[in-house]
Design a protein with these regions (language model features):
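A detector for small-residue-rich transmembrane helices and their helix-helix packing motifs
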Residues: 1-194
Length: 194
């Protein structure tokens, strides 16, 4: 049973429900469409956890990792949970829960540093930086084992993962840099932990 992967997916889904539907300041106007589909960043949790260079410089360093708990819109949360389940289960079957969690958190942290202080991203949220880190570790394990089918991941799941990976790079310059820095962080964590 992939303990980290399933627990993390449950956590980000729980945070998504709280932030998008329940914990919204009364002073904010959020439409039904924003709540159900396109998303918004007006919730209390988003304000407390999103990536922000200014707030990190004021000592709120948890934002380097906590932003990975946030998602804007239904497509964002569904695609990230799907990708996390596919790649996370595969990596966790080889490395175990603790090393998988360290790879995810390390990649998110490294990407957060890059996006906040090099790229100068104003605000950011999403689990994809850690997911791209796990994809990097997945590729490293595949090379080490000599095959992409080293885990219980079926071929169709690998196709979905490939679409997620390529599609995520096409969403714009900022998103591409987040994903590339997450992948680079995953490579670094993979070299350290494998």
């Amino acid at each position: 049973m992939p303990v980290f992967t399933t627990s993390f997916c449950a956590l980000i889904f729980f945070v998504y429900i709280l932030d998008n539907f329940l914990l919204i300041p009364k002073t904010e106007t959020v439409t039904v469409k924003e709540k159900l589909w396109s998303g918004h960043n007006k919730g209390y949790i988003n304000h407390a956890l999103h990536l922000s260079e200014k707030k990190i410089k004021r000592g709120q360093i948890w934002r380097l990792v906590s932003s990975s708990l946030l998602h804007i819109g239904t497509w964002h949360i569904v695609s990230n949970i799907t990708a996390t389940l596919i790649v996370g289960c595969a990596v966790e079957s080889q490395l175990g829960a603790a090393k998988t969690a360290l790879c995810y958190i390390g990649a998110t942290f490294i990407s957060g540093l890059y996006m906040a202080f090099v790229y100068k991203l104003g605000e950011g949220e999403g689990a994809s930086t850690g997911i791209y880190g796990l994809i990097a570790v997945f590729v490293m394990l595949a090379v080490k084992n000599g095959t992409f089918f080293f885990s219980p991941v079926p071929a169709i799941a690998l196709i979905v993962l490939a679409v997620y990976t390529v599609g995520g790079m096409l969403l714009g310059k900022t998103t591409a840099f987040e994903h590339i820095s997450g992948f680079a962080g995953g490579l670094l964590m993979g070299f350290i932990l494998m």
